């Protein structure tokens, strides 16, 4: 077998030199004739190499460089990454139909970290030495966001890959320019809107301007309603609104209308009157009361001079304060919470409201003189 490896006539070994042949040649040596030997005998002696553990080490194989073998898979994988960027820049939904070998798991130490270049006709991405090239980084993850243009610079590519590798980026960010500027949705919500503007109450208060005050010629004071103030300087006989019963003058018509109600007793009008049910208004009714009570000296328990009220609230306040008896020490705000009794008939009730609705308004009290008109 050794003679066959040295013989040049073997075309297979001359065409495909192997490492085994070089390995065998290192252990071959030509012995020159010693001075003691005869000069006519020259022999070629080959020393055998050390025994290898591989039993088939003597078999010669063709060189791997001379065979038509495609490139390593990691180069094809880099080529596939470049094709993905190319298809992504051209806005194609699917990558190009380029044939490539199936991907193999290659240790990260065999991959060049600083000289990896992704070349493309429209975009170029360079991996710096500080960037990680471990298989955990998903550099070729599918991208669903559209891009505005295909011309990307090195900084834009690096920012794009950093966004893909860090999923903690907020989803509220949107890409609006080739430089991948981020704009939050909160800024869009607070943008001023020209249409359908609503003026707040504060703006109305700011736009509101007070009325200009005018100076009174008599007292030299300033008033916003000078006409109403001038009526206070008028004498009772010179005021514009005069009562036809007592010829008393009033500055405003409301004051005159309130004053006329006091004369309704004299004119005998029942319009708008609220009469106290326990007040003797005329002498005829007083005589009837004397017959009922049998005592002419009984007071009417009314401190009002006429017993006629022009307002309903003052009429009810008069009844609750004068004609209903509360427990000793009852305060005004506690009147609706305590029980009491009618001062005239001494009948007990739960509270003053119960006495008003079920005793006074129904004219149930036997000592009531004036009947209360029921509202229909």
Swiss-Prot record:
Disulfide feature: none
SUPFAM superfamilies for the chain: beta-beta-alpha zinc fingers
Gene Ontology biological process: filamentous growth
Family annotation (SMART domains): ZnF_C2H2 (SM00355)
Ranges of Low complexity composition bias in the record: 32-50, 89-103
Alphabetical list of InterPro entries matching this protein: Transcr_Reg_ZincFinger, Znf_C2H2_sf, Znf_C2H2_type
Name of the protein in its database record: Transcriptional regulator STP4
High-level lineage: Eukaryota, Fungi, Dikarya, Ascomycota, Saccharomycotina
């Amino acid at each position: 077998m050794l003679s066959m490896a040295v013989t040049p006539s073997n075309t297979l070994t001359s065409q495909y030199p192997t490492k085994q042949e070089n390995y065998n040649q290192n252990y071959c040596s030509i012995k020159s004739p010693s001075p003691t030997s005869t000069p006519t005998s020259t022999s070629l002696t080959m020393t055998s190499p050390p025994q290898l553990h591989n039993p088939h080490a003597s078999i010669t194989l063709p060189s791997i460089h001379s065979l038509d073998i495609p490139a390593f898979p990691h180069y094809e994988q880099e080529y596939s990454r470049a094709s993905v960027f190319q298809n992504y820049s051209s806005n194609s939904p699917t990558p190009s139909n380029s044939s490539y070998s199936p991907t193999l798991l290659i240790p990260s130490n065999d991959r060049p970290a600083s000289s990896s270049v992704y070349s493309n006709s429209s975009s170029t991405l360079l991996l710096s030495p500080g960037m990680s090239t471990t298989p955990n980084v998903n550099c070729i993850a599918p991208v669903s966001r559209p891009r505005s243009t295909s011309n990307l610079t090195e900084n834009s590519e690096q920012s794009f890959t950093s966004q893909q590798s860090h999923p903690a980026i907020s989803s509220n960010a949107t890409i609006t320019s080739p430089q991948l500027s981020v704009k939050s949705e909160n800024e869009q919500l607070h943008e001023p809107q020209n249409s359908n503007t609503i003026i707040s109450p504060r703006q109305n208060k700011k736009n509101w301007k007070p009325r200009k005050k005018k100076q009174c010629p008599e007292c030299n004071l300033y008033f916003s309603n000078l006409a109403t103030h001038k009526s206070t300087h008028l004498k009772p006989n010179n005021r514009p609104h005069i009562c036809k019963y007592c010829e008393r003058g009033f500055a405003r018509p409301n004051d005159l209308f309130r004053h006329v109600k006091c004369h309704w007793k004299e004119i005998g009008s029942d319009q708008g009157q609220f009469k106290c049910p326990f007040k003797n208004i005329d002498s005829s009714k007083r005589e009837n009361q004397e017959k009922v009570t049998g005592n002419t000296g009984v007071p009417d328990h009314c401190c009002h001079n006429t017993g006629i009220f022009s307002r309903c609230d003052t009429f009810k306040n008069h009844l609750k304060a004068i004609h209903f008896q509360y427990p000793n020490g009852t305060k005004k705000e506690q009147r609706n919470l305590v029980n009491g009794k009618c001062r005239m008939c001494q009948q007990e009730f739960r509270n003053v409201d119960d006495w008003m609705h079920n005793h006074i308004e129904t004219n149930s009290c036997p000592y009531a003189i004036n009947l209360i008109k029921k509202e229909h």
